[in-house]
Every structure is written in structure tokens, then in C-alpha cells.
Amino acid sequence: MIQQRTLKNTIRATGVGLHSGDKVYMTLRPAPVNHGIVFRRVDLDPVVEVPAKAELVTEVTLCTGLTCNDAKIQTVEHLMSALAGLGVDNIIVELSSAELPIMDGSAGPFVFLLQSAGIVEQDAPKRFIRVLKTVEVTEGDKVARFTPYEGYKLGFTIQFDHPMIPAKQSRQEIEFSTLAYTKEISRARTFGFMRDLEYMRERNLGLGGSMDNAIVLDEFRVLNEDGLRYADEFVRHKILDAIGDLYLAGGQVLGAYEGFKSGHALNNKLVRALMADATAWEWVSFDSPATPDPVEYATPAYA
């Protein structure tokens, strides 16, 4: 039996936006059953609410951003990833700016915040999106694909011509569970190349980026003094991003995801393609104690 989850307590954090460089105050609040994940721009008058839905994605350049009633919410993928990892279904995310705080560039600080607030089960079954047939989208040589699978599994392959990202560290798979997510994926940081800095700054991107919140590489090496958290941290972060992007489907996917050089744009295209084909998926719940749980979530952490 898998129940919906929300926070036990309200919790707050402060940080800077990776791309905007703006300081942002974030408040995470509990929400009722079937409320879903909703972002709230409290700096606007009137306040605007933006549901975490794939169809509202309008920004896919180096982040995933949502727009609703002209209000933007940028760089949602790391928090969305942490919410998926801990099985949180219902939450209100209040922001004083358009972009979520980047924290350390991973989902680890968001996991800590959510666990510190406490996670509680609610009196309603969690709703899953079960993949019924293969759905694939491509863009050049990039591929993102869902296939039917009893559980939730993610595989990802990256290709970078860089000595710090050899082929043997460019492929990773994970059988999704809270334990696997928190240990193997959540601490993997976003990364960028010095050669791309000029491109980003011309587009007002990465203005809040630093070695405190990203892995930075020159042509030969990692420039961060503390090095990497995992030998294959780069591909693990791509899985972290994918978990967040796919959670915008409006529920936890049950199926196998495969990404080859995929990014935010293709991940969003895949979710939209899945949801657009009514024969490709169905809503399911597991509200009988006799039914095996398809995904292992950690016991709720009561703060």
C-alpha cells in the first residue's frame, strides 16, 4: 500500500538562482490530498500559482522552466527530483523570485530540507502513471524513451569529448527507490564547461554559477578543489535531472526510461508524447496491503 505524502511542517531556505543570480527566499508548505506540486510567486501582486505540469514547460535551455499567467518559475528540476525521490505528492513551494535557489548544484540540500520538515503519509492512495507501450522521441542523434516495466528504472548515456568523462563513466542505470536515489543520485551536481561561459553570459544564463554550486571543467580537468563526489558524477546528474523532468508528468511514472544524450527539452517532449497518447499509459494505485509495492519509498521521516 502506497499513500500520498506531504510535509509535516513548513520549512524555509535562502539561496541564489543559478541563471539569474538573484537572491531568493523559498518556503515549502504542506498541501492537502490531490493538491499536487504547486509553485507560488509571492513577490507578484496578486500572487500567481504555477502547477508543476509538463504542459506548462516553456524554458528548456540549460534548465526546466514553467510559465502560467505570464508568471515564470525557472530551474525546477532539482527540487522536482528530490520530491520524486522522497515520494512527496502534495506541496506548496513559495518563491520570492522567478528562479529556485541552486543550493550546491545537486538535489542533496532539497532532500535534507524535506526530511528536516518531516514527511507524512496522507489518507489517499498515491497515483502512478503506468507506461503501457513504448514511446520514443528523438532529436538528431539524441533519444529519450519509455518502455513498460514493473517498477521504475532509469538508464542514461552521455557523450562528451573530454578526458574527465571517458566512455566507461558515461553510462549509468538505477532501479529507482528512495534509498538508491538518496545514496547514488541526489548528491550529483550540475556541471559546465569554461568554453561555454561566454555563450551563457550573452544569454543571461549562469549568472549565479560558481564552483560552490557546479562542477566546472576546462579543456583537461575539473577545476573544483574538492573534485568529484562520484567518478561518474556527470551521468548521475543527468539521471537526477531526468527524474525531476519526468515528475512533471503529474505523477510518478512506472516504466523504464532510457536517455541517450537527452536533456530538458527532449525529456519534456517525451512526457508530452506519453500523455498525448491515451493508449500508452493509465493511472494506477496500490491501495491493497496484499499488492506488492512497485517502488520502494523510505518510511516517512517525522520531524
UniProtKB/Swiss-Prot annotation:
EC assignment: 3.5.1.108
Binding-site positions, Zn(2+): 78, 237, 241
Catalytic residues, chain numbering: 264
Residues spanning the membrane: none
Cofactor(s) needed for function: Zn(2+)
Family label: Belongs to the LpxC family.
PANTHER family cross-referenced by the UniProt entry: UDP-3-O-ACYL-N-ACETYLGLUCOSAMINE DEACETYLASE 1, MITOCHONDRIAL-RELATED (PTHR33694:SF1)
Role this protein plays: Catalyzes the hydrolysis of UDP-3-O-myristoyl-N-acetylglucosamine to form UDP-3-O-myristoylglucosamine and acetate, the committed step in lipid A biosynthesis.
Record-given protein name: UDP-3-O-acyl-N-acetylglucosamine deacetylase
Organism per entry: Stenotrophomonas maltophilia (strain R551-3)
